[in-house]
Amino acid sequence: DWWTFHEMRKKRINFFGYVLIFLPSLVCALHLILLLCGERSMYSFRIVSGTILLFTVPKLVFTIISAGGNRLGRLFHRDWKHIQGVAFFFACIVAVVQFYCVTVGINRLDVNRVTLASPLLPKSFDGYRVVQISDLHLGSYFSDDSFVRTVVDSVNSLHPDLIVFTGDLVNESPDEVLPEFVNALSCMHAPDGVYSVLGNHDFCVYKGFPSEQEVRRATDKVVRLEQSMGWEVLRDEHRLLVRDGDTLVLAGTDNVAKPRPRREGEYVPPAGSLKKALRGVPESHHVLLLTHDPWHWRREVTSDPRVLFTLAGHTHALHVRLGNFSPAAWIMPEWGGKYVSRN
């Protein structure tokens, strides 16, 4: 914004031009202040993230190209008169792409088929089909269940042996799970059932409930809603999947996340426990683990030889993905796709 202001001073821009360019940043700053002051509002979070995607990122692209072009022009003693136009062109392209992502892309469904192989997998589970869905964040769809029904139809069309959900059914409150969503998600079926674990949002800590008791009650309501849909919620526990005499252990933990600074008076739900989830599982058995945050995998899971495969969600590729690239790769070792540990 400073560079934009600096460039605008050279041109005859009226008051409304300044308002048009800087108002998004002011709105973003206001809601960012609310978030930093403890106003844990998903509405404010959406305003901040949406403004960054639609306005800040394109302006950043404009600034980098414009400033870089001017600096190179001075370095090589050339007058690049059209650099502002080039910068504006690329900024517009980025803005259009971002607009597509937050309007059309949010309802785009991709089915990724991944083959997991291991000589340790019981033979009866060769060809076993697991469908994983994650991070529905139902509050993002308000009362429109069309995309959720598309997801359900896609899942059922794959004829899975097992369906798993790896957390974040809601944004901040069980009130987001409207009856139409319950009806839709109740229609997912698989011979070995539908299992789920809780993600960080499912603990409802972002709603700003006034007490720990209310947070716990909200979390319990999320669990009951999932159970009412026919899902079995694994909270640091496991179940046995049996096929033709062979056994595969299905385990699930509550969210285990990277520690972060805690605000004064903030309630932080207890982390899930892999040890508790695998209590009683013999060393000879192998485990398919459900967890929410992939950070958990390298932190604890890879050191347990019983865990053969781990399924996680959470990252959303930071909501920005172009092919196999996402900025998430800069801050998350595991952000999407298949990863193999040599432990």
What are these regions (language model features)?
Residues D1-E7, V61-F62, S66-A67, V97-L121, ...:
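Binuclear metal-dependent phosphoesterase catalytic core
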Residues D1-N107:
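Non-catalytic terminal accessory segments
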Residues N107-N112, A117-R224, M229-E232:
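Membrane-embedded segments
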Residues R113, G127-S140, T247-A257, L288-H292:
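Active-site-proximal beta-strand elements of phosphoester/diester hydrolases
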Residues A117-V131, W231-E232, H238-A251, P282-H286, ...:
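Beta-strand-turn-beta hairpins that frame and shape the catalytic cleft
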Residues S134-L138, G167-L169, N200-D202, E237-H238, ...:
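Active-site metal-binding loops of divalent metal-dependent hydrolases
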Residues S186, V249, L288, D293-N343:
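Conserved beta-sheet core of the metallophosphoesterase superfamily
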Residues Y206-W231, R243-V287, W297:
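Binuclear metal-dependent hydrolase catalytic cores centered on His/Asp/Glu-rich metal-binding motifs
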